[in-house]
Amino acid sequence: MDKKTSRLRRATRARKKIQELGVNRLVVHRTPRHTYAQVIDANAQVVAAASTAEKAVSEQLKYTGNVEAAKAVGKTIAERAIEKGVTVVAFDRSGFKYHGRVAALADAAREAGLQF
């Protein structure tokens, strides 16, 4: 089993548990160049989204694949979710370790007002 398959198995297991709860989830995906975040409701509809690929976020950053960029995405996704009336979410790290950019995004979203 390779690294990607292991990550996807962890992600599937976590998503099933979150699905049973029937709550909104904050989904994080990262690539070497960008960080993406979406708030998805219980009916699998995207409520809010933010990423370093967006011009609004990336133009204030020097580099889009680091911890500072993830913090900017976390703050932006929290603001957009709160605008739509979502304040409580479950954190779906998509099988990535809770470390570095994933942890930075989560911390920034919490500081901006999301609860999880």
From Swiss-Prot:
<keyword id="KW-0699">rRNA-binding</keyword>
<dbReference type="GO" id="GO:0008097">
    <property type="term" value="F:5S rRNA binding"/>
</dbReference>
<keyword id="KW-0694">RNA-binding</keyword>
<dbReference type="Pfam" id="PF00861">
    <property type="entry name" value="Ribosomal_L18p"/>
</dbReference>
<dbReference type="GO" id="GO:0003735">
    <property type="term" value="F:structural constituent of ribosome"/>
</dbReference>
<comment type="function">
    <text>This is one of the proteins that bind and probably mediate the attachment of the 5S RNA into the large ribosomal subunit, where it forms part of the central protuberance.</text>
</comment>
<dbReference type="InterPro" id="IPR004389">
    <property type="entry name" value="Ribosomal_uL18_bac-type"/>
</dbReference>
<comment type="similarity">
    <text>Belongs to the universal ribosomal protein uL18 family.</text>
</comment>
<keyword id="KW-0689">Ribosomal protein</keyword>
<dbReference type="GO" id="GO:0006412">
    <property type="term" value="P:translation"/>
</dbReference>
<dbReference type="GO" id="GO:0022625">
    <property type="term" value="C:cytosolic large ribosomal subunit"/>
</dbReference>
<comment type="subunit">
    <text>Part of the 50S ribosomal subunit; part of the 5S rRNA/L5/L18/L25 subcomplex. Contacts the 5S and 23S rRNAs.</text>
</comment>
<keyword id="KW-0687">Ribonucleoprotein</keyword>
<dbReference type="InterPro" id="IPR005484">
    <property type="entry name" value="Ribosomal_uL18_bac/euk"/>
</dbReference>
<protein>
    <recommendedName>
        <fullName>Large ribosomal subunit protein uL18</fullName>
    </recommendedName>
</protein>
